[in-house]
UniProtKB/Swiss-Prot annotation:
Belongs to the YbaB/EbfC family. GO terms for cellular component: bacterial nucleoid; cytosol. Gene3D superfamilies: Nucleoid-associated protein YbaB-like domain. Keywords: Cytoplasm, DNA-binding. Binds to DNA and alters its conformation. May be involved in regulation of gene expression, nucleoid organization and DNA protection. GO terms for molecular function: DNA binding. Its main location: cytoplasm. This is Nucleoid-associated protein Clos_2855. InterPro entries: YbaB-like_sf, YbaB/EbfC. It comes from the Bacteria. It is found in: Cytoplasm, Nucleoid. The lineage of its organism: Bacteria, Bacillati, Bacillota, Clostridia, Peptostreptococcales. NCBIfam families: DNA_YbaB_EbfC (TIGR00103). It holds the Pfam family YbaB_DNA_bd.
Amino acid sequence: MAKKGGFPGMGGVNMNNMMKQVQKMQKQMEETQAQLEQKVLETSAGGGAVSIKITGKKEIVGISIKPEVVDPDDVEMLEDLIMAAMNEAIRAADDMMSSEMGKITGKMNMPGLF
């Protein structure tokens, strides 16, 4: 049976307070995720030869290729530039999401839980 103020072995953590914190954090995370999904990041490769625009939802919303890098005799180079720019865009979207979510989860103070 639980003692007043917490559960045995959990350092006096009050489950009601902990649940309120978790619910608040979950709401903040949902709001932040919705905001980040609307943000557009732009990354590039080859010194700006290929640029990619990506949302926080990891949807590609734009690709720009400078005409001077389009060489019919070297399609492989263009493919490599596009791949590098897309990979960088995905990393940037992941980093943005992780960073913002970390700000929320880092604020959670639940002594004795971890």
